[in-house]
Amino acid sequence: MAPKGKAGTKGKKQIFEENRETLRFYLRIILGASAVYAAVNLVVFYPAASAWTWLAFAFSSAVYGASYRSMSSMARPAFADDGSLADGGIDLNMEQGWQSECPHPHEPRHLKDVILLTAMVQVLSCFSLYVWYFWLLAPGRALYLLWVNILGPWFTAESSAPGQEPNEKKQRRTGTPPE
């Protein structure tokens, strides 16, 4: 049974250890998916491998590299002069993320989702290169978040110019009723 009340906070050392384990876990996923893809497409089916196979491998490697590097830079700890842990880095395992109301595009959960999506697509593409079309879910999700959190509220916000605000004193003087 979950404890009632406010959730406990994590200490710097716990965040540091969990981040290290999280990065290790995602590195294993990256290496495993890349090894399966390379073994199947670039070793077993080498004669049938086309330029698209090599391009897909390069693309997935670039996505993995960028996502993993971003996650590791977020989780980079800071140490004091005496070698003690001063800051454990950003918690990569937060439930709500940095800002629950407006998700940041480089939030750790989105980067982890990109790594997992790429790994699944990469392994499944051993059966068909058409599986790479599923990777279009990532920019689709990015456009959805852009619309929901930035563009949608901006387009649907009520426009009120500062000079058009009803002035109560002016309304009382002229005798016009407020709207």
Swiss-Prot record:
Residues 159-179 are annotated as: Disordered. It is a multi-pass membrane protein. It is found in: Endoplasmic reticulum membrane. May function as a negative regulator of endoplasmic reticulum-stress induced autophagy. Its main location: endoplasmic reticulum. The keyword Aminoacyl-tRNA synthetase does not apply. The keyword Plastid does not apply. The chain crosses the membrane at residues 25-45, 51-68, 114-136. One of its GO terms (biological process) is autophagy. It holds the Pfam family TMEM208_SND2. This is Transmembrane protein 208. Belongs to the TMEM208 family. The lineage of its organism: Eukaryota, Metazoa, Chordata, Craniata, Vertebrata. Keywords: Autophagy, Endoplasmic reticulum, Membrane, Transmembrane, Transmembrane helix. One of its GO terms (cellular component) is vacuole. Signal peptide: none annotated.
